[in-house]
Amino acid sequence: MKTVLMVAEKPSLAQSIAKILSRGSLSSHKGLNGACSVHEYTGTFAGQPVRFKMTSVCGHVMTLDFLGKYNKWDKVDPAELFSQAPTEKKEANPKLNMVKFLQVEGRGCDYIVLWLDCDKEGENICFEVLDAVLPVMNKAHGGEKTVFRARFSSITDTDICNAMACLGEPDHNEALSVDARQELDLRIGCAFTRFQTKYFQGKYGDLDSSLISFGPCQTPTLGFCVERHDKIQSFKPETYWVLQAKVNTDKDRSLLLDWDRVRVFDREIAQMFLNMTKLEKEAQVEATSRKEKAKQRPLALNTVEMLRVASSSLGMGPQHAMQTAERLYTQGYISYPRTETTHYPENFDLKGSLRQQANHPYWADTVKRLLAEGINRPRKGHDAGDHPPITPMKSATEAELGGDAWRLYEYITRHFIATVSHDCKYLQSTISFRIGPELFTCSGKTVLSPGFTEVMPWQSVPLEESLPTCQRGDAFPVGEVKMLEKQTNPPDYLTEAELITLMEKHGIGTDASIPVHINNICQRNYVTVESGRRLKPTNLGIVLVHGYYKIDAELVLPTIRSAVEKQLNLIAQGKADYRQVLGHTLDVFKRKFHYFVDSIAGMDELMEVSFSPLAATGKPLSRCGKCHRFMKYIQAKPSRLHCSHCDETYTLPQNGTIKLYKELRCPLDDFELVLWSSGSRGKSYPLCPYCYNHPPFRDMKKGMGCNECTHPSCQHSLSMLGIGQCVECESGVLVLDPTSGPKWKVACNKCNVVAHCFENAHRVRVSADTCSVCEAALLDVDFNKAKSPLPGDETQHMGCVFCDPVFQELVELKHAASCHPMHRGGPGRRQGRGRGRARRPPGKPNPRRPKDKMSALAAYFV
């Protein structure tokens, strides 16, 4: 029996599709990577009985990156990244072992059916899967077709079965367009980012950003936000005057009239008009009109409109809204959420989709009435040729989904029902009055038929007071006429919804990437999200955009990226050559990069005004080992130490607190040690600023603290404080934290394992002796007499933290947010876990602290 391998984009999709195609009769097991399951069943394929194996990937299998040495910022000129630096495809997540997993499942298979998402990224992943699987599949005989592509827009029985019955081929051109975009973004983004990050972080201490990134899409996105900020800053309010009149229609009722001139900017002229109208006692009716108008039902829903509404009405950021929509899609509640189309296909089953909502407690009455009276033909929208508009695929309740998932699903469903409803019809009445020489108007609206606003009440015509019945020549007494002084207002900061509209209009990003670009400028500290989800640029974001404008406006204007997007679309359509587009675009940006580097002084002048130089930033913390003067600690990201006398900057560990460590000095370079801590319940370790940046020994790497230093005799080093192999990771050593008392901690110097132990002990010391069972260093603990856990009022005990039954009761392991016993040999802590070499796979050395200090010294000095 032949075997058909089928691959979806996510594990949940694979399970849903397999259940539909197998009609529920399938067997499942976990794959070797633990993240993806394999679902097996028998059936027929190409007219013959076969065994189906349905599995998945977890998004992209591969990612594009530079070869090893080109990833070292200090050793490569960023200009080389445009052409000279070779790239390679690496596994997107090496921990998943996705390539090996696909090869294991694909070995010996005869056919492959690709169920990846039906967009350009999905096509690209198709070929990543094929690159892994085709070499291990059985060879085709006589030109037999073995590779198939399923195209679908929703996870419903009908759509999946139709896709299986109409298999096609993956689109190589669409995959190439994604390859081109990835390479362009990698080369251009890395070159500009590396240059400006190194240039400015070496000069200014309060940039508050660990990475000053540039992106071909990200930067124009930021440009829109800064452009609005500039308009606000340059806005000068103007005073204007308005006449407001009130007429009495009966004893208890009056009408407020709007001036036909709207406003004037000269007070004297406004005063003249006021004087002319103030004398009049009656307002004459000049004209009346009553017109029936309609408010159009919405177009079918596409991604951009969904993101706009999610931000403006639901308070959900674009990235979060997209993730929520993807979850609803994989669970089968909505159709594919990435689409540019706003027009339902001719064969779209509108009645069938509507019928699914007929019993919903919130909109059942509206749906039943539509089905009984006949649905209205949806408006003709734009057909982008990708996926149908976003629609609900099955009924769901608030209790079933909950939270943001329900709110987004509710909006999508209400929007769908509205597209097949009738327009909202209302009567607009207008009365024009003359008071002296001036004309005033009032208008009112009366709803005739709510139409689609019944299901989208927030779109309904606002209720207004009905106007009195009157005709030309009628007179009404004037209640009052007054002059109001007002001022013009500046525009507000862009909302996310407005930014999405601008990005779509100018062709910046795609429906899938727009949320990513907006999220990036927030994470890079270029903008902050204010109330009402408005995007306010930070000082750094403003200076960067102004700097780009000063040097080369095309770096921030949307025009050049829009042109690139058009070229990428031509690749996807097979109308442009991949290599030519790539080469031409890189050549353009390479020239721009060289000009940018030569003109960086222009941006630097703007930076000088907004940010402080390193020497003037920070507070004195620890002494430099070279000049013995105080170095300044710069807390803004990335935190670092700067010696203004030596003009040297030393990087520090991030995402924690830094403080002086007892004024102790490193025995190698005389720098004062500092202590890094992630909090009272997390890790902490001392480090020498110089050794952290310039490793003193061959087996040390940049960025290692004292807990990884192999100095044979320093009291802070791994040699003196190391205990034994980590209980979780393969390369780490558990090291005593000597600063943690009286709540003592032992932490791994590689992973985030922290063991809390010996609370309230006076002193904990790592002994030179080792355990006879596991070879870990013994700990000598001096307990508080009043709280000693030892029998017979003893206060001192030496033992192995892993094997000694006394110590086993006093140790608790913390790993990330979870808390569990450190010794897991059985249900209780007493049983131990059996350390030593048995746990480590063959060929892996067992890390432990060095024991023979003289041998270690000899190794370094020889």
Curated annotation (Swiss-Prot):
Which residues catalyse the reaction?
Y336
Listed under GO cellular component are: condensed chromosome; DNA topoisomerase III-beta-TDRD3 complex; nucleus
| EC number assigned by the record | 5.6.2.1
Entry's InterPro entries? Topo_IA, Topo_IA_2, Topo_IA_AS, Topo_IA_cen, Topo_IA_cen_sub1, Topo_IA_cen_sub2, Topo_IA_cen_sub3, Topo_IA_core_domain
Query: Which terms under GO biological process does the entry name?
Result: chromosome segregation; DNA recombination; DNA repair; DNA topological change
- Xref: PROSITE patterns: TOPO_IA_1, TOPO_IA_2, TOPRIM
Q: Name one GO molecular function term.
A: DNA binding
As its record notes, the protein acts as a catalyst of: ATP-independent breakage of single-stranded DNA, followed by passage and rejoining
Disordered as annotated region, ranges? 821-854
UniProt name for this protein: DNA topoisomerase 3-beta-1
